Amino acid sequence: MNLEELKKRQGKIRNFSIIAHIDHGKSTLADRILEKTETVSSREMQAQLLDSMDLERERGITIKLNAIELNYTAKDGETYIFHLIDTPGHVDFTYEVSRSLAACEGAILVVDAAQGIEAQTLANVYLALDNDLEIMPIINKIDLPAADPESVRTEIEDVIGLDASEAVLASAKAGIGIEEILEQIVEKVPAPTGDVTAPLKALIFDSVYDAYRGVILQVRVMDGVVKPGDKIQLMSNSKTFDVAEVGIFTPKAVGRDFLATGDVGYIAASIKTVQDTRVGDTVTLATNPAAEPLHGYKQMNPMVFAGLYPIESNKYNDLREALEKLQLNDASLQFEPETSQALGFGFRCGFLGLLHMDVIQERLEREFNIDLIMTAPSVIYKVNLTDGESMDVSNPSEFPDPTKIATIEEPYVKAQIMVPQEFVGAVMELAQRKRGDFVTMDYIDDNRVNVIYQIPLAEIVFDFFDKLKSSTRGYASFDYELSEYRPSKLVKMDILLNGDKVDALSFIVHKDFAYERGKLIVDKLKKIIPRQQFEVPIQAAIGHKIVARTDIKALRKNVLAKCYGGDVSRKRKLLEKQKAGKKRMKSIGSVEVPQEAFLSVLSMDEE
């Protein structure tokens, strides 16, 4: 293609993504757009086509972003090239959203006509505004009996401040309004700006590992052209690779002769290790490099840490390989080896949040067949020592001796909770119980309230989300961002079994709740740990002070069964003998801790 044609083609490209809260119909809308543009034959069509992971389809959530090229012949007779970049809606996957938005010029904002705006809708809209995208609101599910599109329209204008007068009323399920949406994309989403003649600059927004071709980069070309045979260079580490193939996704990968400015597609360049390709990096040509990289989006830091251990210790290397493979297309997953006396060898992993942690654990168990034990999640604490030093600790077993600690600071998050008015009391009670500080509360409309709290992240990590859903019958929506570190009265609690510390059961707790938390755990462990041949004390200790204790009674054989009647001294002799044997067992016996015991520390609650 000559320059003229390339520029004309660039004017026909529209890059957009779809943003929405969970369950507002984003994946269904994507399905309809694929059908309408006949990208996918009706034979291949299946619900949630872009959610290719089993886990995504089962939970009905989108975890990974996907990019697809569609051709659409508009009413003006021209054929446009659409790149649809599907994004997740859940708060833990915000970084997935931010990177797919970096590859777009426009965003379709889907709002449920019955539910209105939810907390994550707002969070994603702000991300889109940060990226200067053209936002087109769409009111979906208008065929529901409870739909009230007009009040949602005013809500979009009041809460977000977008002009919703032209918002398309649609129903992705019934296929209503799909054509209008496509026409609006043509009119409203700007064509990519960028210079075909400039040196190549392409943003890596994802990478997938292919066993045969190595790492495949998903890129959005910002300037220039890339074709097979070019030598490309990654700007963050200056490594060079030879391009073997470029192409696009029409869900399936299809090879192409070139990718030009504005295109979204993939580059295969037999890159061997995932570590070479950071998502957010810039690809350029080695022969004619760009002067400076694109400003990539920010590196996401994990907020939640937990230990992952294989149940069979010989699977340690398999677990490492599995984590490396997952890290390939999940740049936010971090891990380092660690050992525990109770659990053997494993990894300390960092996650973006609880759903992320859940999904990773499930993918490890499913895709790689590794049975795991997971320790209680913890956050990063800043520990200031008496000698003026300070250290970051994410693992309770690394906490220094209490006598050396001057203060401990913990991360607080700004939690935004949207909830129907009748549940405000329940939400406030929950937030208070989780040591939250009230910030503000505004009414969105007559019925819905936006409550903002500062809550310690450690309290959210446990089971805040489940509690929030159950106390509001599932109506609350919730979004959080890290706000600051604050000093807190925190202590480390150890659990002792038969006098020995079990390092994997240690956790950090606020001093005011230490006693009840300790009591709860020892009682819970008593139910879970099977009875042994000897008596086992379970103790909860802070430093050297025991705050709670309970005993698991010994199993004992009835040694008197063989004495029919007979002298009491004979019975006493047998009982004394049994007692001495139990005592000896206790001094050398060790206690097996079942997997549920580690999880029970997690699902701690004020039952």
From Swiss-Prot:
It catalyses: GTP + H2O = GDP + phosphate + H(+). One of its GO terms (biological process) is positive regulation of translation. It is found in: Cell membrane. GO terms for cellular component: plasma membrane. Keywords: Cell membrane, GTP-binding, Hydrolase, Membrane, Nucleotide-binding, Protein biosynthesis. Belongs to the TRAFAC class translation factor GTPase superfamily. Classic translation factor GTPase family. LepA subfamily. Required for accurate and efficient protein synthesis under certain stress conditions. May act as a fidelity factor of the translation reaction, by catalyzing a one-codon backward translocation of tRNAs on improperly translocated ribosomes. Back-translocation proceeds from a post-translocation (POST) complex to a pre-translocation (PRE) complex, thus giving elongation factor G a second chance to translocate the tRNAs correctly. Binds to ribosomes in a GTP-dependent manner. This is Elongation factor 4.
